[in-house]
C-alpha cells in the first residue's frame, strides 16, 4: 500500500468540514496529515524516504496562493527527503506549471524532475555501485619528446569494472613520456631520484673568503641613527650590532674602572697631619693675621700677628716662615 502525506495550508484549519472531506477520500491507515506552516517553522520534521506520494492541498478559495507562498526552500527540501526514490509530488488542483507555481526552479534544484503527467518525480538512481580502479604494472613505452628524439617512460593501465555493463572490458590510458635531462647516461633512474650521483657538493663555507667578510657594510640612509642618538640593536639581532655595542660598553666600563683605580690611595699613602706638633706648617694661609683667623690646629696659636714672610721663632727655637 502506498504511503501518502497531505500538506495542508493554514487556511484549511478554519474549515474542518472540508478537511474531513479530503481525509475521507483517502485511507487513514496509509495517509498522514501535516500543516504546511508547522513544517515551514521547523516544528515538525518529516521522516526520510517514507512516502510514495506527497500532495499539496489548496486553500479554501481554491486558488492555492497561500500554499504556494508557504513553499519555501526548507519545505521543499524536507518534502524531497520524505519522498521515497520514485515518489511523486502532486497538487490537489492540478499540475505544477510555470504559470501556476513560481517555485519550479527550487523544485528542480532540490532534485525533482517533471514526468509525463505534469507532476514532479523523485528519480530512482538505484543502489550505489562501487567502481574499483586498478593500477597495472609499469611498462616502458616509447614516446616522442619535444626535440624529436624517442624517449621511454612508464604508462598506467586503468581498469574500470562496473559489473555486467563493463565486464571483461579493460581501458588502457597511456601516460606521457618522461624526458631524461641527466648528462650521464650510465646513471639509473633510481640513482637520479635518490640523489646518489658523483657530482661534487659545494661547501657553503667556501663561498665567502676573508676579503668578502672584511668589506664594510653600506648602511642605507633610512637605517642610520639620528644625530645624538645611539642606535639600539634588535632583540634577535643577527647583523652583529648587538655584539659591537656590547664590546663598546665593555671598553667604556674598563676605562672608567681604570680611571677610578688611579684616584684611589692605599692605606700606606694616607698620613694624618697634626698641626699641634712643633715644626709643622699651616696650610690655611691666615696664620699671619692672628688667632682670630687661625685654624684650631695652627702652630702659631698664641703668637701675635706678623707680616707674611717674616721670620718667626717658636718655643722650640725653630725658624718658621
UniProtKB/Swiss-Prot annotation:
Region feature Linker, mapped onto this chain: 132-213
Keyword Hydrolase found: no
Keyword line: 2Fe-2S, 4Fe-4S, Cytoplasm, Iron, Iron-sulfur, Metal-binding, Mitochondrion
Motif (Cx2C motif 2): 295-298
One GO BP: iron-sulfur cluster assembly
GO molecular function, one term: 4 iron, 4 sulfur cluster binding
Binding-site residues for [2Fe-2S] cluster, renumbered to this chain: 223, 234, 237, 239
Region of interest called Fe-S binding site B, as start-end residue ranges on this chain: 284-298
Pfam families: CIAPIN1 (PF05093), DRE2_N (PF16803)
Predominant place of localization: cytoplasm
Residues that bind [4Fe-4S] cluster: 284, 287, 295, 298
Keyword Iron among UniProt keywords: yes
UniProt-annotated stretches for the region Fe-S binding site A: 223-239
Gene3D superfamilies the UniProt entry points to: Fe-S cluster assembly protein Dre2, N-terminal domain
Protein's cellular compartments: Cytoplasm; Mitochondrion intermembrane space
Cofactor: [2Fe-2S] cluster; [4Fe-4S] cluster
Gene Ontology cellular component terms for the protein in this record: mitochondrial intermembrane space
Residue positions of motif Cx2C motif 1: 284-287
Family: Belongs to the anamorsin family.
PANTHER family attached to this UniProt entry: ANAMORSIN (PTHR13273:SF14)
Entry note about domains: The C-terminal domain binds 2 Fe-S clusters but is otherwise mostly in an intrinsically disordered conformation.
Name the UniProt record assigns to this protein: Fe-S cluster assembly protein DRE2
Protein's gene: DRE2
Amino acid at each position: 500500500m502506498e504511503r501518502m502525506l497531505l500538506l495542508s495550508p493554514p487556511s484549511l484549519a478554519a474549515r474542518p468540514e472540508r478537511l474531513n472531506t479530503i481525509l475521507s477520500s483517502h485511507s487513514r491507515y496509509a495517509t498522514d496529515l501535516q500543516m504546511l506552516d508547522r513544517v515551514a517553522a521547523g516544528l515538525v520534521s518529516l521522516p526520510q524516504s517514507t512516502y510514495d506520494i506527497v500532495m499539496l492541498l489548496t486553500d479554501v478559495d481554491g486558488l492555492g496562493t497561500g500554499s504556494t507562498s508557504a513553499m519555501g526552500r526548507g519545505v521543499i527540501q524536507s518534502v524531497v527527503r520524505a519522498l521515497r526514490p520514485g515518489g511523486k509530488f502532486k497538487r490537489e488542483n492540478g499540475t505544477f506549471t510555470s504559470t501556476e507555481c513560481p517555485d519550479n526552479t527550487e523544485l528542480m534544484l532540490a532534485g525533482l524532475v517533471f514526468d509525463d503527467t505534469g507532476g514532479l518525480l523523485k528519480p530512482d538512481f538505484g543502489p550505489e555501485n562501487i567502481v574499483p580502479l586498478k593500477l597495472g604494472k609499469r611498462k616502458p613505452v616509447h614516446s616522442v619528446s619535444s626535440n624529436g628524439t624517442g624517449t621511454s617512460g612508464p604508462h598506467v593501465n586503468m581498469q574500470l569494472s562496473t559489473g555486467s555493463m563493463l565486464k571483461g572490458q579493460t581501458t588502457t590510458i597511456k601516460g606521457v613520456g618522461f624526458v631524461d635531462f641527466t648528462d650521464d647516461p650510465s646513471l639509473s633512474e633510481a640513482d637520479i631520484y635518490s640523489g646518489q650521483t658523483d657530482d661534487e657538493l659545494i661547501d657553503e663555507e667556501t663561498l665567502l673568503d676573508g676579503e668578502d667578510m672584511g668589506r664594510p657594510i653600506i648602511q642605507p640612509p633610512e637605517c642610520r641613527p639620528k644625530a645624538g642618538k645611539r642606535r639600539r640593536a634588535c632583540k634577535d639581532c643577527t647583523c652583529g650590532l648587538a655584539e659591537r655595542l656590547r664590546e663598546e660598553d665593555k671598553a667604556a666600563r674598563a676605562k672608567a674602572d681604570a680611571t677610578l683605580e688611579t684616584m684611589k690611595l692605599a692605606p700606606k699613602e694616607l698620613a694624618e697631619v697634626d698641626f699641634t706638633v712643633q715644626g709643622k706648617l699651616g696650610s690655611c694661609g691666615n696664620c699671619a693675621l692672628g688667632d682670630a683667623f687661625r685654624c684650631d690646629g695652627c702652630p702659631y696659636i698664641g703668637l701675635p700677628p706678623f707680616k707674611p714672610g717674616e721670620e718667626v721663632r717658636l718655643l722650640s727655637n725653630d725658624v718658621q716662615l
